[in-house]
């Protein structure tokens, strides 16, 4: 009996040791920046160009009902757009994000999928702003990036009960933007709050864009669903997948956390802060705000 007891105890000890070994937590592998994220971080400083229908309506947001003819750029619009890029480079900026389509749905390029764009027959000076800015960026060595509003207050398919109709419209337009204007370094989505997160099919859209521009860094505004001051390491990513975090117009806090989770997996997400140069916080140009801009050291 003693021998049997001894063997029993030895066997139990061996099994317990195996269990402890198997269950011990592996060393945490903290996510690090990808090549694309590091390139974005290294650019550091850029210009966010808000231009479009709202510029000529003198508003921040419009509802997509203004006639296309409201958009009335000058004949030398292409030269002016190239000038924006030159000024950005002169100021030390390494990237430019252009609002190719804001919430009103008006497109700054000639899209095959809508007449609510710069090529509308009622517009006299049909300048492809996306081409003018992207060409200048490539010439000047400035990284070209695209803002595209998910929310579209003009496009009829957006109002349909079948949400996939608009997703296809959106993918068609994104294909134009990703294949006609050279390298696109960032894709900045906005307006996701107007629908349920799952209605955007973000994984599908993300994969679609990456198939054309593998190194393009993609994110959706309000990525984490919190202001930067409230973000904590390990918070859930609301708009997944995303390559970086957005929440305009706030600055990151000291010791800004970079690690966030989705379905239990950790991801490294740098924060891109966007700030207006307007004292009153306007994104688009307004005549009444033309003389009151912030200097470089004004908070």
Task: Enumerate the language-model features and the residues they cover.
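Mature catalytic domains of secreted/periplasmic carbohydrate-active enzymes
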Residues: 26-299
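Bacterial Sec-dependent N-terminal signal peptides
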Residues: 1-29
């Amino acid at each position: 009996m003693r021998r049997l007891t001894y063997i029993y105890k030895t066997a139990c000890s061996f099994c317990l040791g195996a269990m402890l070994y198997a269950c011990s937590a592996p060393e945490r592998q903290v996510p690090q920046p990808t090549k694309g994220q590091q390139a974005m971080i290294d650019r550091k400083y850029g210009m966010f160009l808000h231009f479009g229908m709202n510029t000529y309506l003198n508003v921040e947001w419009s509802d997509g009902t203004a006639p296309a003819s409201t958009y009335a750029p000058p004949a030398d619009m292409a030269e002016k757009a190239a000038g924006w890029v030159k000024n950005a480079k002169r100021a030390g900026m390494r990237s430019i994000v252009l609002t190719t389509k804001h919430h009103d749905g008006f497109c700054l390029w000639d899209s095959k999928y809508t007449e609510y764009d710069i090529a509308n027959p009622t517009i006299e000076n049909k300048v492809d702003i996306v081409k003018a800015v992207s060409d200048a960026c490539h010439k000047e060595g400035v990284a070209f990036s695209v803002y595209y509003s998910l929310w579209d207050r003009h496009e009829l398919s957006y109002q349909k009960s079948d949400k996939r109709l608009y997703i296809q419209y959106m993918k068609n337009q994104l294909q134009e933007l990703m294949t006609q204007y050279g390298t696109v370094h960032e894709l900045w989505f906005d307006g996701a709050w107007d629908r349920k997160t799952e209605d955007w099919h973000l994984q599908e859209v993300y994969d679609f864009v990456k198939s054309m521009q593998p190194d393009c860094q993609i994110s959706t505004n309000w990525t984490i669903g919190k202001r930067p001051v409230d973000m904590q390491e390990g918070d859930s990513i609301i708009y997944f997948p995303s390559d970086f975090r957005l929440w305009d117009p706030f600055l990151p806090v000291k010791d800004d956390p970079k690690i966030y989770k989705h379905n239990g997996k950790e991801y490294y997400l740098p924060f891109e802060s966007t700030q207006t140069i307007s004292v009153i916080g306007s994104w688009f140009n307004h005549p009444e705000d033309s003389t009151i801009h912030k200097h470089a050291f004004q908070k």
